[in-house]
Each structure stands twice: as structure tokens, then as C-alpha cells.
Amino acid sequence: MVKPTGPTDVNVRKLIRQLEKTKRPIFKYIAELLSKPKRRKKHFVVNLWKIEKHSNDGDTIIVPGKVLGSGELTKDVKVVALSFSQTALEKLKDKAIYLENFVEQAKDKKLPNTKILI
């Protein structure tokens, strides 16, 4: 039988538990994605051009992985991710929000126009 694996980073484990406690379906789905083994999360890396392609003005885009800085983002969107590359942070400036901070801010708020990009 295969040994179950998951994230070894303590901070990611805490985040998964925090997401599961919120009891919101979107956060539970993100927790499920984050608890997958690393070999199955390689495609959780998203470039800015993909966010530009799949978003509209006013959207909140959640990436359960890393955002890279390839491409440009001209639309007015908030980008929430587990981590950002340095070039992505420079291009996004105040539009970038870390997932831990977003969960604390959005516990009791409605989340209209929210999309998960994988």
C-alpha cells in the first residue's frame, strides 16, 4: 500500500487546517488542492498572462500555488496565491494578496467574482 503523502511545510499544514475550519466550500476545495502530494501539484504554477486571459475586471483570482511574472496584467483584479515570484510581485504591486491574509480577511464576507486558476 502506498504511504499517504502531503505537504511537509508546517505553514502550509496550518493553512490547510485553517481553510478547513472556515466551512466555506471554496476554501475547503483549496485545502483539498493544497493537501495533494507535490508530484501532483506541479501544474499549480500560473503566469500573469494566464490570469489576464481568464479574468475580468473586478475579479478575485485564487491560485493555490505560485504566481510567476511572465506576461502583463492590465485588468483590475486581485490575485491571491500561496506564493509569488519576485517579478510577479513587482508587476502586481498592491494587487497581490497572500492566501493566509486573504483567508483571515474573507472569513465572513461574500466572495463574488472569485475564480480559482490552476
Curated annotation (Swiss-Prot):
It comes from the Archaea. SUPFAM superfamilies: Ribosomal proteins L15p and L18e (SSF52080). Keywords: Ribonucleoprotein, Ribosomal protein. InterPro entries: Ribosomal_eL18_arc, Ribosomal_uL15/eL18, Ribosomal_uL15/eL18_sf. Gene3D superfamilies: 3.100.10.10. GO terms for cellular component: ribonucleoprotein complex; ribosome. One of its GO terms (biological process) is translation. NCBIfam families: PRK04005.1. Belongs to the eukaryotic ribosomal protein eL18 family. This is Large ribosomal subunit protein eL18. It comes from Nanoarchaeum equitans (strain Kin4-M).
